[in-house]
From Swiss-Prot:
GO molecular function, one term: methionyl-tRNA formyltransferase activity
Name the UniProt record assigns to this protein: Methionyl-tRNA formyltransferase
Entry's EC annotation: 2.1.2.9
Function: Attaches a formyl group to the free amino group of methionyl-tRNA(fMet). The formyl group appears to play a dual role in the initiator identity of N-formylmethionyl-tRNA by promoting its recognition by IF2 and preventing the misappropriation of this tRNA by the elongation apparatus.
High-level lineage: Bacteria, Pseudomonadati, Pseudomonadota, Alphaproteobacteria, Rhodobacterales
GO cellular component, one term: cytosol
Catalytic activity: L-methionyl-tRNA(fMet) + (6R)-10-formyltetrahydrofolate = N-formyl-L-methionyl-tRNA(fMet) + (6S)-5,6,7,8-tetrahydrofolate + H(+)
Family in the record: Belongs to the Fmt family.
Listed PROSITE patterns: GART (PS00373)
Length: 299
């Protein structure tokens, strides 16, 4: 099929690769413009742009799609379907209507749960037992369109947002290829009005660990914010990111170091399995502890 691909971050790259590998004609790749990055703040192309250029695909990165010229350029591509995955721009109705069969979105949740910007983070933060990927026919509302195909996956007891991100990206790549192959037989399923939740962007204020909370909540926070933005605490005045954890045996005063990198919470305890000191690379807990001594209690 003749497609337009619209995506920006690393999550979208396996999808683009899968579409090309399946033999689809990608008429153009739309992504966010290069952003300043690194110490020199030089413009850096997005992961999708970098991959598209390697694949020899035409890349477009308009700042907006609201203008008549941008919309005409999009329509002129003559796409049968636009595949959208974490693109980052709102698609006006004229863009949604331009492809012959509309725009299909790959969304990393089991809609209508976790509509919005941060569905992977929010699923772990909420303690969901499962999540998944939906292929959705886009409409004007925020992730409200009918679902064409879905698949659920269990969330591991020690899984982080980073690990789940990679699994769902691969699942989305497989599902979109399947959905395109089965387009003629798929029946759009309207989303139910019950069970709707919204996955708001992660606020940095959420990231500080409060050891007075129950261990189950602290564990979800650490795993749900790993690797970005990263839950954190202060150890001897140094901000340390906590990037991996598991529930542990033991109890004590909130923030008390019980053994190794196991800390008491308001109820129960959490073992930190991976962390990152300021200005250093992430490391397993054992390596972190070789380089620093924990106080008797953390704030």
């Amino acid at each position: 099929m003749r497609l337009v691909f619209m995506g920006t971050p690393a999550f979208s790259v396996p999808v683009l690769d899968a579409l090309v590998a399946a033999g689809h004609e990608v008429a153009a790749v739309y992504c966010q413009p290069p952003r300043p990055a690194g110490r020199g703040k030089k413009p850096r192309p997005s992961p999708v742009q970098a991959r598209a250029e390697v694949l020899g695909l035409a890349v477009r990165h308009p700042v907006s799609l609201k203008g008549a010229e941008a919309q005409a350029d999009f329509a002129a591509l003559g796409a049968e379907i636009a595949v959208v995955v974490a693109y980052g721009l709102i698609l006006p109705q004229a863009v949604l209507d331009a492809p012959e069969h509309g725009c299909w979105n790959i969304h990393a949740s089991l809609l209508p749960r976790w509509r919005g910007a941060a569905p992977i983070h929010r699923a772990i933060l909420a303690g969901d037992a499962e999540t998944g990927v939906c292929i959705m026919q886009m409409e004007a509302g925020l992730d409200t369109g009918p679902v064409l195909l879905r698949e659920a996956v269990a969330i591991g007891a020690e899984e982080t947002t980073g690990g789940l991100h990679d699994r769902l990206s691969a699942l989305g790549a497989r599902l979109i290829v399947e959905a395109l192959a089965r387009r003629a037989e798929l029946v759009p399923e309207p989303q139910p009005e019950v069970g709707v939740t919204y996955a708001a962007k992660i606020d940095k204020a959420e990231a500080r660990v409060d050891w007075s909370r129950p261990a189950v909540e602290v564990d979800r926070l650490i795993r749900g914010l790993s690797p970005v933005p990263g839950a954190w605490c202060e150890i001897a005045g140094e901000r340390v990111k906590l990037l991996g954890s598991r529930l542990a045996e033991g109890s004590g005063a909130a923030g008390q170091v019980l053994e190794g990198f196991t800390l008491a919470c308001g109820v129960g305890a959490v073992e930190i399995t991976r962390a990152q000191r300021a200005g250093r690379k992430a490391a397993d807990a054992a390596e972190i502890l070789r380089g620093m001594t924990l106080p008797a209690r953390l704030d």
